Curated annotation (Swiss-Prot):
<dbReference type="InterPro" id="IPR038612">
    <property type="entry name" value="YkfF-like_sf"/>
</dbReference>
<protein>
    <recommendedName>
        <fullName>UPF0401 protein c3666</fullName>
    </recommendedName>
</protein>
<comment type="similarity">
    <text>Belongs to the UPF0401 family.</text>
</comment>
<dbReference type="InterPro" id="IPR009253">
    <property type="entry name" value="DUF905"/>
</dbReference>
<dbReference type="Pfam" id="PF06006">
    <property type="entry name" value="DUF905"/>
</dbReference>
Length: 77
């Protein structure tokens, strides 16, 4: 879709709203185990296999996610 660009998070923990912004921009990023405030962000490869996941509340969650998005994120077109 036109207008989608790379989305980069701050290096620390991230909010649900920030998570939604990322899953809107990338087609292989998902939210998992969503009981409310604490959830996991998951990146899958083209075959659907999990490549990475972390909890949104981890101290370096954004830093880890940014690195995985740079190497394996599939932007929506």
């Amino acid at each position: 879709m036109p207008g989608y660009t790379e989305y980069v998070l701050a290096e620390g923990s991230f909010s649900y709203g920030q998570a939604v912004a990322v899953i809107t921009a990338y087609r292989n990023v998902f939210i998992q185990d969503d009981p409310g405030m604490h959830f996991r962000r998951v990146i899958r490869n083209a075959e659907g296999q999990r490549r990475w996941r972390c909890r949104n509340s981890e101290a370096d969650a954004g830093k880890q996610l940014n690195a995985w998005l740079a190497s394996g994120g599939l932007l929506r077109q």
